[in-house]
C-alpha cells in the first residue's frame, strides 16, 4: 500500500474509507459483504450456501445513468461471489 510506503496518513485514510464503504458507509447504507456490516443482502451462489465474509463481483448501474443502484434482488451479474474480490479485500486489510 502506497500510504504505508510513503508514510502518508492521508493516503492511509483513503484505504480505511474504502473498507468502510464496502461495509456499509456508502450511498446504499448497505454492506456489500454478506454477513458483516450493516444491512447486507444475499449474494448469488449457485452450488453452496451463503458464505459469511464473501464479496460480490461489483456494483450495478441503473441503465446508462451514473447513480447509486444496489437493488435487493439477487442476480449473478453483480451479486455473484468471485474469490478474487474477497481475496483482494483481505490483502488490503493485511496492509492496513
Predicted regions, residues:
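Aromatic (Trp/Tyr) and acidic
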Residues: 1-96
Amino acid at each position: 500500500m502506497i500510504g504505508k510506503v510513503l508514510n502518508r496518513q492521508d493516503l492511509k485514510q483513503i484505504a480505511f474509507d474504502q473498507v468502510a464503504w464496502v461495509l456499509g458507509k456508502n450511498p446504499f447504507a448497505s454492506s456489500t459483504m454478506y454477513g458483516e456490516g450493516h444491512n447486507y443482502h444475499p449474494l448469488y451462489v449457485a452450488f453452496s450456501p451463503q458464505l459469511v465474509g464473501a464479496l460480490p463481483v461489483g456494483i450495478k448501474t441503473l441503465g446508462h445513468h451514473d447513480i447509486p443502484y444496489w437493488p435487493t434482488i439477487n442476480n449473478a451479474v453483480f451479486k455473484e461471489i468471485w474469490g478474487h474480490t474477497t481475496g483482494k479485500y483481505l490483502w488490503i486489510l493485511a496492509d492496513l
